[in-house]
């Protein structure tokens, strides 16, 4: 895929920055990369403490650089420059390149389950998921008997407004012959309109990808390992979350635990089996030692299900997904997005040093007591810190280090206030960095 002119210009900037970093530090960017990767690796393996606690950070791009969040959907080069500026200024041990995607493509497809900045939302907002009942309670058998047919004729027409005509197709599994019989339907105005919208989305996505390139690799070339190796392979998270958030919706999946438990479990099993069957092993030739496979998790929270329900519907699928990810050569990186509490004990059933438990609302001290010496903690500073002062963030983080930092096996994601100067951000990160030395 040929690179755009803007992408080529960005590449030249990266080369100049690389040379500047090497002059400033007296080290190659490859050496700096490995120093940070070693620090992260030591924390993950839980064998010995690293030289200091590894740090990541996620300041608001608009607050720090003046580039709105909408750039991640409509101005990829500006977004990449913003993420690069944040990385070079704050020097995290794991860099975040963001999750940019084409807003033009999303709009053309009329996506129903997402709202994004610069599109349905103001430019400075964060992307939002919109849950819906994309699969009805009486459609489990349709999904289980022929998932491909269900996706094409039921799921896509509901999830993407542009693809609504697909609901008029006959069952795809029956079209062994006689495809020509449905060509009049495909030639109708509504199908032609759909094809044009898909083509528009395809062109926009291709252009966006050419421009955005491999942002994580470009930051790695400047000496910064990726937080998570997106697109590298792995299995994904808990299959229950797939059913709950992308098929039945929260309400539907909660009802199904009582009214259709066996169908719900069958769907979870099928989703996981298909994911495992198509999973790609870690590529030893690519960066990442170890490679980290992210897994966002949410419905296993104590407020969504009881311990008994967790043991029946959630943990078996999640455990299999994490073990399969580990078997493929990755470190499983589950993001426990809510209050999982003592349910983290189940991570002790997995191999030592092969999981990073990302927590935010869980008591970090209790989590460290449960997992110390076995599973690395990735502790995210609370979202409320966006409105804290620099002093409050610094005090909270240093107190966390005092209580949980001993013996290694911990990394910190320092969420920074939305208001402040660049000098203030850098001073705060430097202070936390030095305080976290062993």
Description of each model-found segment:
Residues 1-438:
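Catalytic cores of TIM-barrel enzymes
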């Amino acid at each position: 895929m040929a690179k755009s002119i803007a992408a080529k210009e960005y590449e030249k900037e990266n080369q100049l920055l690389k040379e500047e970093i090497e002059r400033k530090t007296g080290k190659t960017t490859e050496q700096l990369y490995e120093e940070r990767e070693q620090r992260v690796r030591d924390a993950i393996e839980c064998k010995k403490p690293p030289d200091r606690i590894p740090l990541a950070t996620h300041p608001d791009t608009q607050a720090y650089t003046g580039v709105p969040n909408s750039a991640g959907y409509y101005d990829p080069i500006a977004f990449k420059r913003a993420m690069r500026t944040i990385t070079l200024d704050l020097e995290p041990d794991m860099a975040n390149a963001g999750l940019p995607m084409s807003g033009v493509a999303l709009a053309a497809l009329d996506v129903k389950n997402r709202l994004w900045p610069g599109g349905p939302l103001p430019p400075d907002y964060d992307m939002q998921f919109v849950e819906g009942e994309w699969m009805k309670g009486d459609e489990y058998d349709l999904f289980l008997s022929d998932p491909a047919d269900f996706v094409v004729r039921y799921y896509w027409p509901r999830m993407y407004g542009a693809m609504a005509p697909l609901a008029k197709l006959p069952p795809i599994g029956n079209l062994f012959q006689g495809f020509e019989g449905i060509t009049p339907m495909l030639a109708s105005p509504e199908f032609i309109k759909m094809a044009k919208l898909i083509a528009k989305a395809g062109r926009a996505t291709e252009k966006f990808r050419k421009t955005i390139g491999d942002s994580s690799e470009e930051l790695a070339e400047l000496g910064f390992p990726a937080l998570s190796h997106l697109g590298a392979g792995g299995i994904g998270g808990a299959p229950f979350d797939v059913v709950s958030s992308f098929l039945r919706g929260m309400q539907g999946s909660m009802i199904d635990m009582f009214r259709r438990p066996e169908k719900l479990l069958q769907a979870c099993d099928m989703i996981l089996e298909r994911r495992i069957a198509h999973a790609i092993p870690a590529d030893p030739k690519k960066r990442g030692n170890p490679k980290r496979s992210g897994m966002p998790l949410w419905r296993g929270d104590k407020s969504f299900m009881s311990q008994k329900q967790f043991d029946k519907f959630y943990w078996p699928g999640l455990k299999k997904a994490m073990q399969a990810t580990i078997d493929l050569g990755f470190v499983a990186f589950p993001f426990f997005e809510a209050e999982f509490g003592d349910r983290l004990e189940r991570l002790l059933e997995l191999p030592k040093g092969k999981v990073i438990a990302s927590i935010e609302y869980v008591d970090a001290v209790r989590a460290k007591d449960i997992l110390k010496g076995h599973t690395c903690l990735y502790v995210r500073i609370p979202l409320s810190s966006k409105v804290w002062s620099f002093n409050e963030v610094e005090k909270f983080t240093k107190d966390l280090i005092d209580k949980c930092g001993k013996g290694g096996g911990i990394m910190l994601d320092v969420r920074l206030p939305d208001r402040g100067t660049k000098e203030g951000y850098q001073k705060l990160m430097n202070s936390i960095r030095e305080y976290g030395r062993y």
